[in-house]
From Swiss-Prot:
Repeat listed as a keyword: no
Gene knockout outcome: Exhibits short branched root hairs.
PANTHER family: CRAL-TRIO DOMAIN-CONTAINING PROTEIN YKL091C-RELATED (PTHR45657), PHOSPHATIDYLINOSITOL_PHOSPHATIDYLCHOLINE TRANSFER PROTEIN SFH1-RELATED (PTHR45657:SF39)
Highest taxon of source: Eukaryota
Topology within the bilayer: Peripheral membrane protein
Known tissue expression: Predominantly expressed in roots. Detected solely in root trichoblast cell files engaged in root hair growth, hydathodes, shoot apical meristem, and apical cells of the root cap.
Coiled coil (residue ranges): 498-539
Annotated protein name in UniProt: Phosphatidylinositol/phosphatidylcholine transfer protein SFH1
Family according to the record: Belongs to the SFH family.
Cellular component terms (Gene Ontology): Golgi membrane; plasma membrane; root hair tip
Its job: Required for transport of secretory proteins from the Golgi complex. Catalyzes the transfer of phosphatidylinositol and phosphatidylcholine between membranes in vitro. Plays a role in root hair tip elongation as a key regulator of polarized membrane trafficking. May promote the PtdIns(4,5)P2 synthesis and organization in root hair membrane.
GO annotation (BP), single: root epidermal cell differentiation
Amino acid sequence: MAETKPEIEMSEEERKIVKISSLKKKAINASNRFKNSFKKKGRRSSSRVMSVPIEDDIDAEDLQALDAFRQALILDELLPSKLDDLHMMLRFLRARKFDIEKAKQMWSDMIQWRKDFGADTIIEDFDFEEIDEVMKHYPQGYHGVDKEGRPVYIERLGQIDANKLLQVTTMDRYVKYHVKEFEKTFKVKFPSCSVAANKHIDQSTTILDVQGVGLKNFSKSARELLQRLCKIDNENYPETLNRMFIINAGSGFRLLWSTVKSFLDPKTTAKIHVLGNKYHSKLLEVIDASELPEFFGGACTCEDKGGCMRSDKGPWNDPEVLKIAINREAKCSPISEDEHKHVDQGRSTSGFESLERIKKKTDEDNVYEKQIATIDKSMDMAWLAKTQKAENFPISKGLECYVRKGAPKKGDGLLVGGVMAFVMGIVAMVRLSKDVPRKLTEAALYGNSVCYEESTKSKQNQGQFAAPVSSSEYMLMVKRMAELEDKCMFLDLKPAHVESEKEEKLQAALNRVQVLEQELTETKKALEEALVSQKEILAYIEKKKKKKKLFFGF
């Protein structure tokens, strides 16, 4: 019996060692697959359109963070093959400022939400039949691309009628429609824009038209809908906003914005440009006139498609571009383990270029290969003994993917839904503060710039900004606004006239006040007359005293 106990303890220890070894093996395999993430299966196609080089903007620092994040997800079994996308993981890292633990928690919550909501199959399963009626009460959608190839998203907030919107559909159905459109954007629109622009695109440019926005657009139902959309966007589709233009902003809006922006993250405010009614030149600097609707100062009308807001204009409508975009082989995604072994065993197989041909590449390609080899070496310090040298990365004949050296990082920011909810809140507060002095408004308008500084200047002044508004404070503000609205609605429901008895009492009280005021005036007048008489008597007495002194003095 004395010998069996140590044997049992030893077997438990061995099980722990085996478990740790298996986890470490997974991490090693993940690192190896990550290094080959820019390899693709070869394809045999004679189409000239299929050969499209797409430039990638992931730099060396991001690659190292991605490697660590990807290994952490694999060790926790949080990386299904359909979500094994480097750019998607990078967006979650940026949303949590490259904090791997926070990003992993956000990623885990996103996976659970997709299972519960059914986001993976919502494009096929959900049919939004009432879209025509919905667009009448909530005009929004994509129209064209900006000069850098990003899709342009437009919302005309002043034309939103939440009450009529919820008469033609339900809030749950509209939320499903919103998620479906987001899924289509990532599966169709962004890939199509990437093919058309020859570079990876996963962000959009947004235009919010706030002309005519008031309290009617910010009802209780509208706030509830926007809060749900904001929550979904921020938690499951982070970092999709590149820049936002808020146009037709009135003086009160800009005055309040100049105050509110000091409480926001500088990276967020750098993305938001608040413009008045002279916004056309600013939009045309970013968006070509042929891609901008006529009602925004552009040249596009989309008459044959029912107007710009219904046309869904963009490169995703080009059959050739769409064919490449929806083809999984046209994406830069990590290859499977079997493919990795196949590449290692036979580099000269169909679909891959031979090593001799790689060595004859241009000097620019050699720079990229050296950079990737350097990154591989830094990421494999833990297993340096097992790795002799970094592998060469063959480039596919079709859709070429490489890392651009020194690519700029994108800043953190809010999503369209979140910013839209915040904008609606600001507009509501502006409408409630109409008695702000005009001189104060003019001082804010002519003392500050309407279009705010770019990210380079905001970074220099980061120390001057206060801490951003937390979500709890924002929700508290929204709650108080809801309570205020309920009180206003309660007062509106009361009858405008007062009961006759109360009115008579009130009138009698007013008459009594008038009588008292009249009596007070008369009393005041009598008192003044008495004071005058008293002064005359005192003066007469003084005069008599002086005469008496003179008489006895002689």
